[in-house]
UniProtKB/Swiss-Prot annotation:
Gene that this sequence comes from: dxr
Protein name: 1-deoxy-D-xylulose 5-phosphate reductoisomerase
Binding site for 1-deoxy-D-xylulose 5-phosphate: K137, S163, E164, S188, H211, S224, N229, K230, E233
GO biological process assignments: isopentenyl diphosphate biosynthetic process, methylerythritol 4-phosphate pathway involved in terpenoid biosynthetic process
Reactions listed under catalytic activity: 2-C-methyl-D-erythritol 4-phosphate + NADP(+) = 1-deoxy-D-xylulose 5-phosphate + NADPH + H(+)
Amino acid sequence: MSAVPLKNTDAAHDGVRSISVLGATGSIGDSTMDLLRAAPEKYRVEALTGNANVAGLAKLAKEFNARFVAVADPARLGELRAALAGTDIAYGAGESAVIEAAARPADWVMAAISGAAGLKPALAAVDRGATVALANKECLVCAGDFFMSRAVAAGSCILPADSEHNALFQALASGNRHELTRVIITASGGPFRTWSAADIEQATLAQALKHPNWSMGQKITIDSASMMNKGLEVIEASYLFALSPDEIDVLVHPQSIVHGMVEFADHSVVAQLGAPDMRIPIAHCLGWPDRIVGRAARLDLAKIGQLTFEAPDFERFPGLRLAYDALRAGNGATTVYNAANEIAVAAFIAQKIRFGAIARLVEDTLNAWIRAGNLAPLGSADDAIAVDHNARKMAATLLPQIAAKAS
């Protein structure tokens, strides 16, 4: 049994739906609020959360008349209190308040808090059986088996909000799970798709941040340049759809129009296409099992002219290979992969290591973790958070020698 519904069997939604958005002030949250703004008669906002942008969070709370608002930074409680003065909006600050927001009675929850901080709030929504649009990678990369098992036990419906996984979700509706032979996740190839290994090694921060198609935050843009993001998506797909590593392929598709494909036993391949705009997969989740009017640009294939595909290069982009290695190792290895990558990207942004050293730090951390005998099943959110914490410490310890090798 899967928490991800592969057939649109639910009845259509009637009346007003209650909505909570965890991470309302981030890029995914912004796209979600834009869709809610377009149809205020269909949605009522139950709860909103943000990290530290109190002004933006309070503005959204007032606009949508949210019932509860939480800011993750406990030091911002006074600022939030002042910003909401004169309203009847309830509020709180700190992790417990964010978890309270997630646990409030909303029909549909957008889980878009970035990083490991998003795991416990997402679980709070899952545990009460909510429909959860999942945009937080760490829930799956750091605690995939545990998270999905909890969702099944609680009767929670998980809707993939990431563009590639939402594409697979839509394509999978064309057949049955036992008829699937493989899924194909597409990758733009990032700004270094045609670069040599030597040039990629020396790439600057400014060059890594020039994504050809998507407008995203700094961290994910660098992950796209290294193809670590595609590795994370391979891991997510495995947990979301109960797929083995051998059932997941990656194709480089520079136009970013085909977001995912599913091949079935009869060798039919069903693909989902759309403009590179996060409002498309979010709208699909928000309307599911129905379709709602979109806000993104319509797709004009004649204007695009051609769609091209190529195999990924695991030598120039070893981060993708490492994701498959971590997935096969299991027992927390994917958590280590993600944690080490976050340390490596932060070091690259701080100009402590070269771009090419990102994958080397991830590989060295994974190898050191396995040699130390640290692989073990994750039975709780606290287990996942502990592995994440300790893997970050290990990566930080290995960082100086990685930096020294590159100098």
